[in-house]
Each structure stands twice: as C-alpha cells, then as structure tokens.
Amino acid sequence: MKNYLKILSCILLLSILFIVAGCRPEMETKKQEQVIQYVAENGIIFSHKSGLYDKTELNVHMKAPEGYMIAFTTNGTKPSGKDASGKSELDVTLNRGMSGYIVDHKELMLCPELNNFVLSKDESLPAGVVLNTALVDSKGAVSDEVQTNVYFLNVDFAKKFPGCLVVSITTDPRNLLDYKTGILVTGASYDAWKRTDAGKQVIAKKTWWKAEANFTRKGKSWEKPCRIQIFKSGSVKPDLEINAGLRVRGGMSRAYSQKSFTLYFREEYGNKLLQFPLFDKNREYKTVSLRNGGNDTDYLKFKDTFIQDLGKGGKFTVFDSRPAILFLNGEYWGPYSLNELISDKTMHTLFGVDENNVVVIKEAKVEVGKKEDIKLYEELQAFADKDLTNPETYKKFCDVVDVRSMADYFAMRIYIGDGDWTPIHNHVLWRSRDTSYNGGRWQFIVHDTEYSAGHYSQKLTSPETDHFQMAIQNFPVFKAAIRNKEFYALFLEAIKKAGSENYRYSRVQEKMHSYDKTWGPLMPDFYKRFGESSRKRKECMEATLHFFKKRYDIIIPIVVRFGRS
C-alpha cells in the first residue's frame, strides 16, 4: 500500500510539473504584455502609451535595444548627455508635480510695466507629464531622434471637456522661452524696442497692444517644430499624432498670456497635410489655428464663431470652427476655437477650384496666389472712381464681382455693427484666377467678427451707431455700388433678411444659450490659469443680446432712408 501511495505521489508531482511547465510560456507572455505595450520608432520599448491614466502616479518601464542606454527628461526638454540614465532598462515614476516647466518661467512671458495680465500655477488644473526619451550609444552620444510620450494622470477628458477635441502640443521649451528666439516671451525684441522713442511712449501710456516683442514677430523664421496629439471626445489614447510647425498668430491679442497659434503641416515635418476629421468630416488641411478669441479672449471666447454661425446662409464663405482644449507641453492652456484657415487647399476642397488657380486677397494683399494677382484686385478697386449708376458700367462691374456675394457680405458685417473692419483690416475676398469658377468674379470670406454687437460696450459697436455710413466712408467700391438702384435693392433685401432671420433676437438668444452650455463649464479652469474675468463675460453676453434686441429698428430705417434720398 505504501509503495502504491509513493507511486501515486510521483505521478501527481510529475503531472503538476508538466502542467506548470506547459503553462509557463503563457504566463511569461502575459507578464511581457503587461510590460511591453509598444515599441517606439527610436526602438525603445515602453510599458505604457501616451494617453489618459486614472492614477495619481504612473510607473513607466522602458527598455533600450541591445547595445544602447536611455536618456530621458520629464520637463519637455530634449534629452542630452546630462540626462543619460546609464541604464538600458529602467522604470520612471511620473506624477503631477513633474508638469509646470513653462508656467514656472512666467516672468519671461509677462510684462507688468505694460499690463496686468495673469499666468498662474494651479495644482488643481489637469495636467500631463511629457516623457522625452533618446538612445545613448556605447560612446555616450545621444541620438537626435527623440520619442515624445505624454501621460495625463487622474483626468477624464470626456467629463472635464464634454464635446471638445483635446489638442496636446509638445515642443522643446527653448522654442517657447529662449530670450532671443522663444515665441512666447517678451525677449530680446521687447528689450530693444522699449529703448526706442516709440517704445517709451507706449509704455508711458500703457497702450500694451502696440508693444513689440518676440511674440509679435511673424514669418517662417519664427515657426517652431512641434509634435501634436489629438484626442476625440471620449478617447483615452491619441486618435492622431503628427509633427507640424507652430507659430503665434493674431494682432493685439498676441500680448495676452493665452496666445493664439497657427499649426502648419509641411513635408519638412514629415506630413504635407493633416488628414483628420477635425470638424466631423474627413478632410485634408495645410494649416489650422487655435484662436484665443481675439478681442473676446477674456470675455465670451466664442463670440466670433457665434456671430459667424448665426450669419450662415448668405453667399459668403464661413469656415468651420469648434471648441478645443489645448495642453502645451502637458500644461493646461485653456479653451480655444479650433479654426479652419484660408489656403489654396481649403478653397479647392470647398469649391473644387484647382489649387494653382486660387486667388485670395486679405487686407488688400495677396494671401494666396501670385504677386501679380494684386492687379486683379486693383481692377476691382478701380470701380470706386466710376459711375456705377450707368447701366453699362454696372454690367462690367457685375462681370468682375459677384454682386449677390457682395450685398450679403456687406449686409452681414454692417448689421452686426463690426467695429474692426476696413479694406486693410479683417477684409477678405477670393476668386479663381481664370473664369472657370463663377466667371472669375470676386466673392467674400467672413473673417474676425468678434469686435461687434456691443463689444466693450463702446459707441463704435453700439446698436445706435450708423455702420452703414461707416462702410460707405471706409469702402470706396461699396460707396460707388450702393448708388446703383439694382445693387441697393440687393443690399436692402440682404440686410433685412439678416435682421429678420439670421440675427432675429429670439434666434440669437437661443444660439447664445446653446453656445454657453458648451463654453460656460470650460471657463472656471481658464480663470484659474489666466485670471478671473467672469464679470466681464456676463457683461459681454448682456451687451451682445441688448445689441440684437435693438438693432433691427435702428439700422433698417437708416438704410431705407438712404434709398429714398
């Protein structure tokens, strides 16, 4: 019996060993799956991809290819020799405290002698940690090929920013903060400018919007390489990762702590176009913008998009826009309007015009096209000195410009009381170079409308102000055209429609409520970072509603009286 039990025990032991041995490959595979989630382009193995993690700390395991070690940083900077770990395999524990390198250098971006703008560090704001890694060879040389991962800890984008795209932009902090070349700082440009007579006068008067600084510089030389990650609403991993060029954009709003940006997609960055459904359509883009709101930056933030959205339906172009949240090197940078921008690609997509055949004039300069295309614009401007009440002359005018587009466009901008609109400011029109599209006639594009409809509670944007007469004074071609009875009839029809349909008070109220339902919950975090302005926001909303409540009964009689004179 004892021998029988011994034999049985041996059989059981062998069976267990066999089962364990058979399971070991599967157990090892599962263990590897927990450690190895993906292999980066530079060959480093990571346990975790970029994305959202419901943890206050995250342990990331990294392993280099054989013969290499790993250099890494967690502040957004590019790894160098001093960042070499001396190891080919290691763990790094990431936490919220590692984010904040840019805001920690806020003194480089603020200008207290000119304004009182704010840029605050607040640990309650959502944040991501930027983990940059590079390989180090046996000689200690650090590779230029950097892998950038961004880990957002203990944040749920879907709950925090419902309905918004989240855009994460990473770049070497020197591109933003360097004294000579950083695009977010006052920098060397400001220090040189403030010693000039013009600079001294601006500082004395505190007319901060006239200041010159690194962040007011324009052009390709001020474009910086960056890495972009885009999260759709509800996504926990990036839906897109792409390299691009980054510039500060805008006019006076460049001085704000929260600046607007333009993103450029070029072959030099690896992608000639961005192909992604930014606006729920799978489209290709050469360039897009993240707009802080311009004159509306610390007010509603959505006023430009709101005004343009209400105005849709006229024969003018309104580009797509949607709310987005920006993280800059993992740091919360607030809500923006993500906007489609003018380009030959955009016009081709919208209207089917060959990209090489598109001409866009912005603020009396060629924006898209050839230098000599300015002559086409000058041909239009020449009608300012002609008698458009003459039928033959007006017929020629109609061959050059789409008069329906012109009537609708001018009606819209006059009705909203646009106080920041002249031929050389925020005025855009386009055509095909030849006659293949719409006979080569000029059509209009709506651009930057937030300085309107009671903005700043100024007389310039008041519902009582005669913006019709202002347009006649500021736009010589419009002055000539409005004297023609046929064009006047088109314009009167268009402005009445704008007031009775597009900007009907009840419709404005409804649309305002809809926009505020999305944007309102985004503002408390914005205030934490860039300063409290909720009172101004409330006043702006009230002023906008008041404008449209009063506007029709004031501006329409003005236009009617003109026709009777």
Per-region residue spans from a language model:
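Extracellular and select intracellular beta-sandwich modules with Ser/Thr-enriched
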Residues: V142-T148, F319, P423-H425
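Middle-to-C-terminal accessory/interaction subdomains
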Residues: L165-V167, R174-S189, K194, V202-K206, ...
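C-terminal motif of bacterial Sec signal peptides marking the signal peptidase cleavage site
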Residues: V20-G22
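Bacterial N-terminal signal peptides that target proteins for export
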Residues: M1-S9
